[in-house]
Regions:
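Bacterial N-terminal signal peptides
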Residues: 7-15
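Acidic/histidine-rich helix-loop elements
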Residues: 34-52, 73-81, 107, 165-174, ...
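N-terminal active-site segment of His-dependent metallophosphoesterases
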Residues: 20-85, 89
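Beta-strand-turn-beta hairpins that frame and shape the catalytic cleft
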Residues: 22-33, 136-157, 265-272
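Binuclear metal-dependent phosphoesterase catalytic core
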Residues: 36, 142-145, 240-247, 261-328
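Extended active-site neighborhood of metal-dependent phosphoesterases/phosphodiesterases
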Residues: 84-196, 292-297
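Active-site environment of divalent metal-dependent phosphoester hydrolases
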Residues: 42-44, 75-80, 99-110, 163-166, ...
Length: 328
């Protein structure tokens, strides 16, 4: 009975969210995403005030078409009030937003499923779920062309779970095989509907893939940004990156989790990027807090991306052009 009720609530929330907002390129052929990550918000804790301040400053400056939260939104109780406080900063501006969970979100007294139901009640929410596969926040956000006639960009959102579930293997969990198959099936569907041509796509989740460390340690890889710590990636590689290369659609992957990294490195033709830590001093951090911005141009390969902090921007690069130029 509980499972049936949860499923009905999910369906209601999904239908409401999808009917309320359609993502599309604007008349100038642009679509802008702001990525907030690791807000680590604690309700009524003065150390979190700067995170709300920065969120609003970034939104004032960038005026995005979509806000993506890539996990660890909250870091203390009461969980519901904390989640609402953070997401309402975006919702009150009538900006569509979406969330994927991090390893700390469900450690504050509410499960992922309970947090998901709360998020569904917040206006302008696009967070969804896919029944029957591992995790809660697995869903797709298509971005329509400026005339609304076709899917021009696909945003894949995945749940990277929390901690390893395999005895004897420590650290963090990997994105599971059924999630990878779900991605592959949908990628094939979109490619087939697009006359056999992959639709440019981006992916968002919380915990970095093992390929981040491989790329960051390669002398031949071009990197922009700051790397102050090794990626806390899963010890085991479940093959998501290989699938994305095989499908040929994903141009960029955006994660959080490692607070002292904000770099973006090109690896095997794909941009592996971190967001900028958005939180306050509720947890470790050694970078001025801010956000990553991603600007897509309709009909153009790649994208432009930069970091926005208090009163300034940095690391403004165009992918893949800036990386190919730096390699020469």
């Amino acid at each position: 009975m509980k499972k049936l009720l949860f499923t009905l609530l999910l369906l209601i929330g999904i239908v409401f969210g999808m009917s309320a907002q359609t993502l599309k390129f604007n008349a100038n052929g642009k679509f802008k995403i702001v990525q907030f990550t690791d807000v680590h918000y604690i309700q009524n804790d003065p150390r979190s005030a700067v995170s709300v301040e920065r969120i609003n400053e970034v939104l004032d400056a960038e005026k995005p078409d979509l806000v993506m939260f890539t996990g660890d939104v909250i870091y203390g109780k009461p969980a519901e009030e904390g989640m609402r406080t953070v997401l309402n900063q975006v919702s009150k501006r009538n900006i569509p937003f979406a969330v994927t969970f991090g390893n700390h979100d469900n450690e504050q007294g509410l499960s992922r499923e309970e947090l998901f139901k709360i998020i569904q009640t917040i206006p302008n929410n696009l967070t969804s779920t896919t029944e029957g596969i591992s995790g809660v926040t697995n869903y797709i956000l298509p971005v329509k062309s400026s005339d609304g006639s076709k899917d021009a960009e696909i945003l894949y959102v995945l749940d990277s779970h929390s901690y390893s579930q395999i005895e004897g293997i420590g650290g963090y969990d990997y994105i599971d095989f059924d999630q990878i198959q779900w991605y592959r099936d949908n990628s094939q569907k979109y490619t087939k509907a697009n006359a056999g041509q992959p639709i440019p796509s981006l992916a968002f989740f919380h915990i970095a893939l093992p390929e981040y460390n491989q790329a960051a340690s390669s002398e031949s890889a071009v990197m922009f940004g700051i790397r102050k710590e090794k990626a806390c990636a899963p010890q085991l590689n479940s093959g998501l990156f290989a699938s994305m290369k095989e499908m040929g659609d994903v141009e960029g992957i955006f994660v959080g989790h490692d607070h002292d990294d904000d770099y973006a490195v090109m690896w095997q033709g794909v941009l592996l990027a971190y967001g900028r830590y958005t939180g306050g001093d509720t947890v470790y951090n050694n970078l001025p807090n801010g956000a990553r911005v991603i600007e897509l141009t309709e009909g153009e390969k790649g994208f432009r991306t930069w970091i926005r902090t208090k009163g300034s921007t940095e690391q403004n690069v165009k992918f893949p052009d800036s990386y190919l130029k730096a390699k020469r």
